[in-house]
Amino acid sequence: MDHDHMHGMPRPSSSSSSSPSSMMNNGSMNEGGGHHHMKMMMHMTFFWGKNTEVLFSGWPGTSSGMYALCLIFVFFLAVLTEWLAHSSLLRGSTGDSANRAAGLIQTAVYTLRIGLAYLVMLAVMSFNAGVFLVALAGHAVGFMLFGSQTFRNTSDDRKTNYVPPSGCAC
């Protein structure tokens, strides 16, 4: 097999697999020709376990307590995302729709919601099954509390029909 197209990447030896995850795991992949070797395996499929990195380098580490804190953090991030998605702050006011201050507040809240949604998405991209499940649970609880009819007064006509929020539903 011709490896000339790999431009600076080491040729895989016959004893090791040439998949990206095995190259990272074996420490044979370097960055930009330097001598820095990756220490953490980057998963490409879902896995179970507390030894993972979520959002930040080295976090939560290998501690069970920090992993539990990470799961709680992702759960509440997803709940907060749902709260912002269904908040009355994003709905236009019925009185003065041309109010620029209200428009700026709506834009800021929308931007915050999208940023939080992307953080949840990036956390799930750690491919840790526990993180994935708590993100789903957080979105489900958040929707049940703030988006569904479960805890709403049905006499409020404005909130009886669910309209999915626009933008990223990560």
Swiss-Prot record:
UniProtKB keywords: Copper, Copper transport, Ion transport, Membrane, Transmembrane, Transmembrane helix, Transport
Highest taxon of source: Eukaryota
Annotated TM spans: 65-85, 114-134
Pfam family, any one: Ctr
Comp. bias regions, Low complexity: 9-29
Induction record: Down-regulated by treatment with high concentrations of copper.
Disruption phenotype: Increased root length and pollen development defects.
Chief location of this protein within or outside the cell: membrane
Disulfide bonds: none
Subcellular location per the Swiss-Prot or TrEMBL entry: Membrane
A GO MF term: copper ion transmembrane transporter activity
GO biological process, one term: copper ion transport
Record has NADP as a keyword: no
Tissue-specific expression: Expressed in the root apex, lateral root primordia, embryo, trichomes, guard cells and pollen grains.
Annotated region described as Disordered, given as residue ranges: 1-29
Keyword Transmembrane: yes
GO cellular component terms listed in the entry, alphabetical order: membrane
Topology in the lipid bilayer: Multi-pass membrane protein
Family (UniProt): Belongs to the copper transporter (Ctr) (TC 1.A.56) family. SLC31A subfamily.
Function field: Copper transporter involved in copper acquisition and transport in leaves. Required for copper homeostasis and normal plant growth and development.
Note: The increased root length and pollen development defects phenotypes of the mutants are completely and specifically reversed by copper addition.
Protein name: Copper transporter 1
Organism of this sequence: Arabidopsis thaliana (Mouse-ear cress)
Gene name, Swiss-Prot/TrEMBL: COPT1
